[in-house]
């Protein structure tokens, strides 16, 4: 991590580092190092366990996982956490509401034009990635995949072999 942070500093790059609660608890010094270098710390949920996928979790459990990871990351970093990326990019219609309720303002879980959905968890549900907007947008309060008027902004990550294809 120090080499990566040095490289980013050399070129004036600021990034968002997404950590699961599990990793943050094991390696708090890594989270703190990124935060102290001026980078944003984002939540990546509680863990990557299959049963912790936001596409299968009930709303109440999503809220608990978000509250847990947000508080842990804020306690370690000393900074407010407002960005989220779902583990394995697995979300449900309830995820947008859960994010808003727990104080998140940015989501980065909808990788438009992602083509690995046949090979990953929740693959049938990921077909929505093919029609999601490719540029940042305000989400619908009940659906991260479509534009709306909520206070949650979706910043789609590029997730194709050609780096620029998911962001143009």
What is the role of each PLM region?
Residues 8, 17, 44, 69, ...:
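Conserved, mostly hydrophobic/aromatic
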Residues 1-37:
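Active-site beta->alpha N-cap acidic-glycine motif
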Residues 3, 8, 46-47, 64, ...:
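A structural signal for the main folded, soluble domain(s) of proteins
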Residues 74, 79-168:
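Active-site-adjacent pocket scaffolds in enzyme catalytic domains
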Residues 25-41, 94-107:
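Short, electropositive alpha-helical surface patch
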Residues 16-28, 52-60, 85-93:
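Acidic-and-aromatic substrate-binding clefts and catalytic sites of carbohydrate-active enzymes
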Residues 45-53:
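Conserved radical SAM core fold
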Residues 62-73:
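An active-site-proximal "capping" alpha-helix that borders the catalytic cofactor pocket
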